């Protein structure tokens, strides 16, 4: 059994400037996006679609705004609205952690829609382009959560070799759920989606596969994460994260069905 090391959330201090691990993870996420995007624009079917290196930097600006604003608003509205409405100044303290992926997902969709409209591109093509770069960024975010000792897992069997005590919660062995989500929702999903997107696919197929894979992976890994709150419906209990993942699964299936529908003869 392990004990969470509870590291200092501040990675480095330069005078009055405190550089936090959580911020560094987001910086790493944006850096990997640029790196993978530059690889992706060299793929023949992407190059034929007219994607250029200049598009990446411009798109990243919109994406960063979408992730930060959408992710924070999602955390506020989906998970703990009563706390944030009682302490409104806490909403702006992003460096403390607390970002919702589902909120960030909606924020990026809106930001990319605005960017696509300004560039004269179809927003579905934009989403197909960026989707394979998202999972690794998500993995870095979950590593930031782990360093901050956020999102503790559900109670685990003490015989589990990687069970972990989170001193900021209690003295019970728990699943290291942020690491599960970094590996499954992040790394594994990246590998599957990147391989899928290497070949030319119909419009909406890559974006639809992303929604289906992420929704399914998140629904599964939520079983190991201590829920923020649970929803009871028709004798079934699911977590808030699972509830928010169901629409993504449905959306992904619908997008894939539309993308691969047979053209009329």
Swiss-Prot record:
Keyword line: Cell inner membrane, Cell membrane, Membrane, Transferase, Transmembrane, Transmembrane helix
InterPro entries listed in its UniProt record: Lgt
One term under GO cellular component: plasma membrane
GO BP term (any one): lipoprotein biosynthetic process
Pathway the protein contributes to: Protein modification; lipoprotein biosynthesis (diacylglyceryl transfer)
Subcellular location as annotated: Cell inner membrane
PROSITE patterns xref list: LGT
List of residues binding a 1,2-diacyl-sn-glycero-3-phospho-(1'-sn-glycerol): 142
EC category name: transferase
Protein name, UniProt field: Phosphatidylglycerol--prolipoprotein diacylglyceryl transferase
Protein species of origin: Janthinobacterium sp. (strain Marseille) (Minibacterium massiliensis)
The encoding gene: lgt
């Amino acid at each position: 059994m392990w004990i969470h090391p509870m590291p200092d959330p501040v990675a480095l201090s330069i005078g009055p400037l405190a550089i936090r691990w959580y911020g560094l993870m987001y910086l790493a996420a944006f850096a990997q996006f640029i790196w993978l995007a530059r690889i992706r624009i060299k793929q023949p079917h992407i190059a034929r679609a007219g994607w250029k290196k200049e598009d990446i930097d411009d798109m990243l600006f919109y994406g960063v705004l979408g992730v930060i604003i959408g992710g924070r608003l999602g955390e506020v509205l989906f998970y703990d609205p009563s706390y944030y409405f009682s302490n409104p100044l806490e909403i702006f303290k992003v460096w403390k952690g607390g970002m919702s992926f589902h909120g960030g997902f909606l924020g990026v969709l809106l930001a990319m829609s605005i960017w696509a409209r300004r560039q004269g591109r179809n927003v579905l093509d934009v989403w197909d382009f960026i989707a394979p770069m998202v999972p690794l960024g998500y993995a870095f975010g979950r590593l930031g959560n782990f360093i901050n000792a956020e999102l503790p897992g559900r109670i685990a069997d003490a015989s589990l070799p990687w069970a972990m005590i989170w001193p900021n919660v209690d003295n019970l062995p728990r699943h290291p759920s942020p690491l599960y989500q970094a590996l499954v929702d992040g790394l594994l999903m990246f590998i599957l989606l990147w391989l899928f997107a290497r070949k030319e696919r119909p419009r909406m197929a890559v974006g639809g596969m992303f929604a289906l894979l992420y929704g399914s992976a998140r629904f599964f890994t939520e079983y190991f994460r201590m829920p923020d709150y649970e929803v009871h419906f028709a004798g079934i209990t699911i977590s808030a994260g699972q509830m928010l993942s169901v629409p993504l699964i449905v959306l992904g299936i619908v997008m894939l069905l539309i993308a691969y529908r047979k053209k009329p003869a």
